[in-house]
A protein has these predicted regions:
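Glycine- and other small-residue-rich loops at beta-strand/loop junctions that grip anionic moieties
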Residues: 111-112, 135-139, 196, 386, ...
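ATP/NTP-dependent adenylation/nucleotidyl-transfer catalytic domains that generate, transfer
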Residues: 1-2, 26, 38-41, 55-60, ...
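Short glycine-/acidic-enriched loop or helix-start segments at secondary-structure transitions
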Residues: 15-16, 78, 119-122, 169-170, ...
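Short, structured patches in soluble enzyme cores that scaffold and shape functional sites
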Residues: 138-139, 159-162, 208-211, 398-400, ...
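Short, polar/acidic, helix-capping and beta-turn segments at strand->helix junctions
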Residues: 267-661
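ATP-dependent adenylation/nucleotidyltransferase module used to activate substrates
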Residues: 1-159
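Short, surface-exposed amphipathic charged segments that create phosphate/polyanion-binding patches used
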Residues: 84, 146-156, 172-178, 394-400, ...
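Short, catalytically relevant binding-site loops at active-site mouths
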Residues: 115-118, 140-144, 165-166, 426, ...
Length: 661
């Protein structure tokens, strides 16, 4: 893609440009926001302005057109989310990039954010409005590794501002990254200083890198003390004279060091087993799930839990002989809005959607309608193909949440969406209108993750083993970003969807190995065993992008040692029903997992009916249906069975067909 690079003059924006080129993109223009005249340091939440005197030389060194705009706005909207607001400094960025797009025809924007959600959210907001793709290849990279890469890739940058305990303007201004690397690591270990300066501890100016055709030379400068604080003085360099010099030798840009592919190779190499079923390397459909065409499922709603959760299941458009996916999606949302309004809620209260489609070929057309019903932070979503009744193209089961009363111990309520749209090496950007995760207090509801290579958004080839390793790693990356310290070991419930029955043991072994690795790392848990939710494996016909594996997790940021669980198995003539309840350590979240296992000797239809009969008997004795139910309908039917007057369920009852026979 043709890329405009947002530059501050610092190391991060420069190294992200190098990553863009390594990924096959072409930098065609530079863009910079500068302070008003006679101003060096601007009180901005978004932009680095120290060293702005060098930006013109920076562009000349790269032989690229430079677009600059003076920052007129201020930091007005400083919340987690951003909405267009006149007078905000973010709107200066919008107008700058709008001009560059009109003049240069760029398709993407390079941004050097490493850890700042504040900056990422605002750049993504602007890019969405301008239909540009943000490229943030440094996003959530390990900072020590990243700093080492910058130095080893011949990025020469000087420290031009310091503002942290342990950094002294008189000692450290003007030093190179190579000279500072060891000391910055020491500060990180002692005081928690961000090695790459993501907390504003220091700022840099790049004088040379492999993308430069000439290098910048500083002739004269002065030190300005902004604050003479005894513990954390703030000072910066002001440059009065600089020039460019021809480079006698140029270092080559490393093009074979993609962190995504390196980590993928490492993950699969560490898998000590091989699965013959995975050797074919391609996923195939699993057509043995059947559904009769008669009957229509009605929307149903669970009782509200004490913490404000409720399920709304069976949302779909009316069945018809010649259905259209977009019309049926609109009709489904009309029904959804009506049901939600009856509760006194809005669509913004939805935190998780289970979306079932009759054909994955409708994925793009459905998304084009789906996205119009949600704002900038849509709910997390899990999308799979399922055998729906004839004429029904989709079904949605939605988990809603609204605050009820006060939190336990008067703790504040928190709800936060992780909706990353930038291409990076971290985890896949969204391929649809959903958030990677929604966090409500201690609970984290993750979207389904498939094995897309983050920097290319292409599906990883090689079969279920490799895809399971990568999709599980993506899920853990999302968990850690949503809530620091969260791992797969904090899962209360995990669903893994596969498209081949033979891949069930493959994903189970990957899951088990991952948990064993976590237990080995977390010896601080002591002798008490940490309890992780069960992995329920479901065989479905198809997954988005033709993936072989999709993982969905609900997690809780509690102490897994303090969880409690119980398990009950009920035998039936045609198979078995296993119910597992897991209660979080804080007693605020709980999940109920039900898996139905058919005996190999049981006829499919009769066995299914027999298990459902036994299931209903266990949960209230409703008669069995006259027809077998499709996979998503089981959740709805069980939901209707559970609603008894005067009882409130905690957590959710989630019923799936396990991929075993």
């Amino acid at each position: 893609m043709k890329v405009v690079a947002l530059i501050s003059g610092g190391k991060d924006s420069c190294y992200n440009m190098m990553q863009c080129v390594a990924a096959g993109h072409r930098i065609t223009a530079l863009a910079n926001l500068r302070p008003k005249e006679n101003t060096d340091e601007l009180d901005s939440y978004m932009y680095q302005t120290v060293g702005h005197q060098a930006i013109d030389l920076y562009a000349e060194a790269m032989d690229l057109p430079l677009y600059r705009r003076t920052i007129e706005g201020a930091s007005l909207d400083t919340g987690r989310e951003y909405s267009q607001r006149d007078g905000d400094e973010v709107e200066d960025l919008y107008h700058l990039l709008k001009l560059v797009k009109e003049k240069e025809g760029v398709e993407a924007v390079s941004v050097g954010a490493i850890l700042s959600d504040y900056q990422r959210v605002r750049v993504e907001n602007v890019c969405t409005r301008l239909h540009l793709q943000p490229l943030a290849y440094l996003w959530r990279r390990d900072q020590e590794v990243l700093l080492g890469e910058m130095i080893s890739c011949d990025l020469h940058a000087l420290v031009i501002k310091v503002a942290a305990f342990g950094l002294d303007p008189e000692k450290h201004l003007g030093k190179s990254l190579g000279e500072m690397e060891s000391y910055l690591k020491q500060l990180s270990q002692k005081y928690g200083v961000n090695v790459c300066g993501e907390g504003g501890e220091y700022e840099t100016l790049t004088l040379d890198c492999p993308l430069f055709k000439k290098k910048i030379v500083i002739d004269s400068m002065e030190t300005v003390i902004h604050s003479a604080d005894a513990f954390a003085p703030v000072g910066y360099l002001r440059f009065s004279k600089m020039h460019l010099e021809e480079k006698t030798n140029s270092s080559a840009l490393p093009l074979d060091s993609c962190p995504c592919l390196q980590s993928i190779d490492k993950m699969t190499e560490e898998q000590v087993y091989a699965d013959e079923a995975d050797a074919q390397g391609e996923s195939t459909s699993q057509p043995d799930l059947k559904c009769h065409a008669d009957g229509e499922l009605l929307a149903s709603c669970s009782a509200r839990t004490t913490l404000g959760y409720r399920w709304l299941c069976g949302i779909s458009g009316p069945q018809c002989d010649e259905p259209d996916i977009q019309n049926q999606t609109r009709q489904a949302f009309a029904l959804l809005q009506g049901e939600v309004q009856k509760m006194g809620l809005e669509l913004k209260h939805i935190v998780l959607v289970h979306l079932y489609v009759q054909s994955m070929a409708d994925f793009s057309a459905l998304n084009s309608v789906y996205q119009s019903y949600f704002g900038s932070n849509p709910p997390a979503r899990v999308c799979v193909e399922a055998p729906l009744p004839k004429g029904q193209l989709l079904q949605m089961d939605c988990l809603l949440h609204d605050w009820v009363g006060t939190a336990p111990d008067d703790t504040p309520r928190h709800k936060h969406a992780m909706h990353v749209q930038s291409l990076s090496h971290w985890a896949p950007a969204n391929i649809g209108p959903y958030s990677q995760a929604i966090k409500v207090d201690e609970a984290v509801f993750c979207a389904g993750q498939i094995a897309l290579v983050p920097c290319t958004m292409q599906l990883l080839q090689g079969g279920a083993l490799r895809q399971a390793c990568l999709s599980f790693a993506h899920t853990e990356s999302v968990l850690q970003a949503a809530s620091s310290g969260l791992t797969l070991g904090h899962a209360l419930q995990a669903h893994c969807y596969v498209t081949r029955r033979r891949d069930v043991p493959v994903v189970r072994r990957v899951w088990q190995r991952k948990l064993e690795e976590l237990r080995a790392e977390e010896e601080s848990f002591g002798e008490e065993e940490a309890q992780c939710g069960p992995l329920v494996v479901v065989v479905v016909p198809h997954l988005p992008r033709g993936a072989a594996v999709e993982l969905h997790v609900i997690a809780s940021h509690d102490d897994p040692r303090e969880r409690s669980s119980s398990r009950v198995t009920t035998q039936a003539p045609s198979g078995a029903i296993e119910c597992q309840v897991l209660l979080s350590g804080t007693r605020q979240c709980a999940t109920v997992s039900l898996s139905l296992t058919l005996l190999p000797s049981a006829p499919a239809t009769a066995g299914e009916e027999g298990l459902l009969q036994a299931l209903r008997g266990a949960f209230g004795g409703r008669p069995a249906p006259s027809r077998p139910l499709p996979l998503p309908a089981v959740r709805q039917d069980l939901l209707q069975t559970r609603q008894r007057p005067g009882r409130t369920a905690r957590g959710r009852a989630d019923t799936v067909f396990e991929g075993h026979s």
